Amino acid sequence: MKNVKNAHMGTHLLVEVYNVPFEKLNDRDKIEKVCVSACKTEGLEVLNTYIHQFDPYGVTCTVTLGESHLSCHTWPEKNCVAFDIFTCGTKNPRSVAWWVLEYFDTDDYVMKDYAR
């Protein structure tokens, strides 16, 4: 049996973004478009997407990738968003994140990546 305990399976990038305008965080269609476009622009294979608009506000978007996933969760009432990208292929999740960050238009974020 092969020991996979120390095997590198991919890179998981976690991003928390602050001071984002309410309107950007509550725009369901635009968030879905940005997430899907960021993945496709960086050459990731989009298998499917799921988007949910919460009442009274907030959006969750998940993009299932051939290489793993991107998920995005917004809190318009707190002017923040958290998203993560896991890639198990050769693509760098940071390159996808820059496209998403461009939409949210703030320099107030924390980005951490983890080898998995």
Regions found by a protein language model. Give the residues of each.
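Polybasic/polar functional segments that serve as interface/processing modules
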Residues: 1-116
